[in-house]
Amino acid sequence: MSILNRQASASVLYDTPGPKARTRYRAFGVLSVLGIAGLLWYVFNALNDNGQFDAGLWDAFQYTFVQQRIVDGLLSTLEAFGLAALFSLTLGALLAAGQLSDHRPVRWFCTAFTQFFRAMPLLILIVGLYYAFFAQQPMWALVLGLTLYNGAVQAEIIRSGVNAVPRGQGEAAYGLGMRKTQVMMSILVPQAVRSMLPTMIGQLVVTLKDTSLGFVITYHELLFVGKAIASQPINAAGFPYIPVVLVIGPIYIVMCLLLTALARWIEARGRRGANRRTSASA
């Protein structure tokens, strides 16, 4: 019965393609794959003709001081990300609470603050903070810029999650005599965070990648270190642009994958805890 229902719902959404349509779709798929493969082959040949895949370009990574610079850049990236993640989540929670406040001045201020920094280009914000206040401390210009921008985004995520909780739950809590602070902290916010956790972690992944903007203000994070290594010629082999990309790029990918895996683990653990509480109450 469920299979029939799925087929019926699918037929409502779109017409089932016939034999000619399926053949046409397969042809489009094959042509797309061939086109992408041809483009990749063209790029590979162009880079290979310029010597970007010469073995000599990898010699830079044999030196201990180069390896240490990459490690230091990675640690600087993680330091900036850790501070920005902590501060942006805290700021986002405060701004979300302010936007949901019953006091109009607080609600208006928090809403204006959130909308302003959401609309502000992050690079302009970081560069402005650097030249205005943190010319000698580029890390704090990067951290504060990431905090203001991502805090505003996190505030909207949390606010949307709270508003998505069924209204009846809050009304029932008020009916039991609970104050608004108790309703928010005990009922609405936990459910909002649980439902919006994937989106919040997704924004933290964006925060992690945005730490690479620190190279613009000479903060020695991972991208800045990679750019410095790539700008040094390796004897007669040339500049190691491709080797640097192949080393630095996967580091960012692994960090983002680990953060995503952490989010899935936290989400699964929260579901198991909720199921246990439901079973115990039953």
Predicted segments, located by residue:
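Transmembrane alpha-helices and adjacent helix-loop boundaries
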Residues: 2-282
